[in-house]
């Protein structure tokens, strides 16, 4: 952690330096330059837990006074202890030259004691600032606007035709989420979940190379089959308007495959339709198309795939920053304008492309880019592990590793600042997912390395729900039901968990303060010991990979698995470079 002085101007403080900040628009250029990804910047609007978003009130005054105290302690730390040394020298000279040798020996000891006292005071101030922030984030929430009983009466009287739609977006239901049941059928980490359009089936993919289609209400698998992949299945999605008969899949082996399902509840075959030279983490579906979708890979390539063609895949773009390729972890199609799609990966930029206007000779084909301004020139290399569009395409949500979650207005111009920031979770160990929840994208939901699920109210950035989602320690995948107030989650555990608003009372967020503080401390410590972090990541990655190889060895024998339609016609990305094999591959490890 840097020893930069906190600034209390206008009541702003960077929490990593012991202070709070108001909004991105109010930050000066100098302050933005000082902000680092290792710290949690807290806007005053985030600290206010009222839905009005009022910056005023008594909390403001106390925050400013705390910021002043922190600044004074920060000045002591900055001196550490040049000013102290000068002070001691002046005192020594005033004593004259007649002091004893014993006094000379005691002076360094006194200096050390002063330094330790200064460091202890600074640590105490940081802890107090952290405690103040956590307390403000977890105070009582105001009364929700949507009330169940009045809404039920209106429905009975025929004046509320959209009861279910409104109920799914009501905070009171989200605060009553409780684990309903688990779906057990995998023998490895579950990396992907996807509901079909009707919401009756749920597809899951795993490190065990299997895909299972669940009747999640009856808690029974409808069918399960070998994916045909040779390594961890990262995504499996029903193609829309296909009668639930086609599943698209991608995996660590770089393959993009399609499974054809029959009405007799079996998988007829799987075939490879594209090949990345690097892991492929995500697919992007067009909302109404049963034949076309996009894939993105760590080789920086985006393929467009049309199942009606003899050669389904064609290269759409190679993502670059200047001349350097940027490996991709995530891709999403704008639901309101399917010509546009957004990608994120091994750097800090959200890139938006328009398929009709891609010219790699002009701005590398990019329509526009977004990035939190404090991360543009940050020394710590931030990666985007997941991004999603809102239901109407007006907003874009991006989750950064070892950082926070940011909301952008997708209609803003190139280089625009984020509009909201969501804090408290930890995104470090795996490629963490993020999603909107609610029919109008009213909430933001994310997993965390601490094994918990966090739900924020989108408008106020307040944590409104906090659930233990994974005993294995990491929650990666979160899939809202398309029509009901139901959430499916998965992670390092080998099961799928189904959540519904069946609790008798709203959550009390028990243990949230301790978890948030622990997450922030760990993030700060990792930022100070980046080399040790990389070593631990590499060890974790190698151990996990060796376990998976032993487990899957039997599936690698000839003749085992789905039919292999891997003809040479399936295109592969020839665009690869040594740049892609750096430590960033481990910074955003897949599960």
UniProtKB/Swiss-Prot annotation:
Return the motif ranges for Nuclear export signal. 40-51
Question: What is a single Pfam family found in this protein's UniProt entry?
Answer: WD40
Ranges of biased composition (kind: Polar residues) = 1-25
Location comes to: Nucleus; Cytoplasm
Omega-N-methylarginine found at: 198
Task: Tell me the ranges holding the WD repeats.
Answer: 185-224, 228-269, 275-315, 323-363, 379-418, 426-466, 470-509
Q: Which organs or tissues contain this protein?
A: Expressed in the brain.
- What are the Phosphoserine sites (modified residues) in this protein? 22-23, 100, 123-124
Keyword field:
Cytoplasm, Methylation, Nucleus, Phosphoprotein, Repeat, Ubl conjugation pathway, WD repeat
Name the GO cellular-component terms. Cul4-RING E3 ubiquitin ligase complex; cytoplasm; cytosol; mitochondrion; nucleoplasm; nucleus
Question: Disordered: where is this region?
Answer: 1-140, 552-591
Q: Does the keyword Electron transport apply?
A: no
Which GO BP terms, alphabetically? myotube cell development; protein ubiquitination
Fetch the InterPro entries from UniProt.
Answer: DCAF8, WD40/YVTN_repeat-like_dom_sf, WD40_repeat_dom_sf, WD40_rpt
| Pathway field | Protein modification; protein ubiquitination
- Locations of Basic and acidic residues compositional bias? 66-100, 118-131
Question: Misc remark for this entry?
Answer: The homozygous loop-tail (Lp) mouse has a severe neural tube closure defect, analogous to the craniorachischisis phenotype seen in humans. This gene has been mapped to The Lp critical region.
What role does this protein play?
A: May function as a substrate receptor for CUL4-DDB1 E3 ubiquitin-protein ligase complex.
What quaternary arrangement does the UniProt entry report?
A: Interacts with DDB1, CUL4A and CUL4B. Interacts with KPNA1, KPNB1 and XPO1.
Q: Which PANTHER family match?
A: DDB1- AND CUL4-ASSOCIATED FACTOR 8, WD REPEAT DOMAIN-CONTAINING FAMILY
The family note in this entry says: Belongs to the WD repeat DCAF8 family.
Question: Mind telling me what this protein is named?
Answer: DDB1- and CUL4-associated factor 8
> Origin organism of this chain?
Mus musculus (Mouse)
Q: Which gene encodes it?
A: Dcaf8
């Amino acid at each position: 952690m840097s020893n930069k002085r906190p600034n209390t101007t206008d009541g702003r403080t960077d929490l990593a330096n012991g202070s709070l900040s108001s909004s991105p628009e109010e930050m000066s250029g100098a302050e933005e330059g000082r902000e680092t990804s290792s710290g949690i910047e807290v806007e005053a609007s985030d600290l206010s837990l009222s839905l009005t978003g009022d910056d005023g009130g008594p909390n403001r005054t106390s925050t400013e006074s705390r910021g002043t105290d922190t600044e004074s302690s920060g000045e002591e730390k900055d001196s550490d202890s040049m000013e102290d040394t000068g002070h001691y020298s002046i005192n020594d000279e005033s004593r004259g030259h007649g002091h004893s040798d014993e006094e000379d020996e005691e002076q360094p000891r006194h200096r050390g004691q002063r330094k330790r006292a200064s460091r202890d005071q600074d640590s105490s101030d940081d802890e107090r600032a952290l405690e103040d922030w956590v307390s403000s984030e977890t105070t009582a929430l105001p009364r929700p606007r949507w009330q169940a009983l009045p809404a039920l009466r209106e429905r009975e009287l025929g004046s509320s035709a959209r009861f279910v739609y409104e109920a799914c977006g009501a905070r009171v239901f989200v605060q009553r989420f409780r684990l309903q049941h688990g779906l057990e059928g995998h023998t490895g980490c579950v990396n992907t979940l996807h509901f079909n359009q009707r919401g009756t089936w749920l597809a899951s993919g795993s490190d065990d190379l299997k895909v299972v289609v669940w009747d999640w209400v009856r808690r029974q698998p409808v069918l399960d089959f070998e994916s045909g992949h040779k390594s961890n299945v990262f995504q499996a999605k029903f193609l829309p308007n296909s009668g639930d008969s086609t599943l698209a899949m991608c995996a660590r082996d770089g393959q993009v495959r399609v499974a054809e399902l029959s009405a007799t509840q079996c998988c007829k075959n799987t075939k490879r339709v594209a090949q990345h030279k690097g892991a492929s983490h995500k697919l992007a579906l067009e909302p109404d198309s049963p034949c076309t979708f996009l894939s993105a890979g760590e080789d920086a390539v985006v393929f467009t795939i049309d199942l009606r063609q003899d050669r389904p895949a064609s290269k759409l773009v190679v993502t670059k920053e200047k001349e350097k390729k940027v490996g991709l972890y995530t891709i999403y199609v704008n639901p309101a304008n399917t010509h546009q799609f957004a990608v994120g990966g091994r750097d800090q930029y959200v890139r938006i492309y328009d398929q009709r206007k891609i010219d790699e000779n002009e701005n590398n084909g990019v329509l526009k880019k977004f990035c939190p301004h404090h991360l543009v020139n940050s020394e710590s290399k931030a990666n985007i592990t997941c991004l999603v569009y809102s239901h109407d395409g007006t907003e874009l949500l991006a989750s950064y590793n070892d950082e926070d979650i940011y909301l952008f207005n997708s209609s803003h111009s190139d280089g625009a600042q984020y509009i909201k920031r969501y804090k408290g979770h930890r995104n470090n160990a795996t490629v963490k997912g993020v999603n909107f929840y609610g029919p109008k994208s009213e909430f933001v939901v994310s997993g965390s390395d601490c094994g918990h699920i966090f739900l924020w109210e989108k408008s106020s950035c307040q944590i409104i729900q906090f659930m233990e989602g994974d005993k294995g320690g990491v929650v990666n995948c979160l899939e809202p039901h398309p029509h009901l107030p139901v959430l499916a989650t998965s992670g390092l555990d080998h099961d799928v968990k189904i959540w519904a608003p069946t609790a008798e009372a709203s959550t009390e967020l028990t243990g949230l303060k301790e978890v948030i503080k622990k997450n922030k401390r760990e993030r700060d410590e990792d930022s100070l010991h980046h080399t040790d972090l990389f070593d631990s990541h590499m060890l974790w990655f190698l151990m996990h990979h060796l376990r998976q190889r032993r487990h899957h060895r039997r599936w690698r024998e000839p003749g085992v698995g789905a039919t292999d339609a891997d003809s040479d016609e399936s295109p592969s990305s020839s665009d690869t470079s040594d740049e892609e094999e750096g430590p960033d591959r481990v910074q955003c490890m897949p599960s």
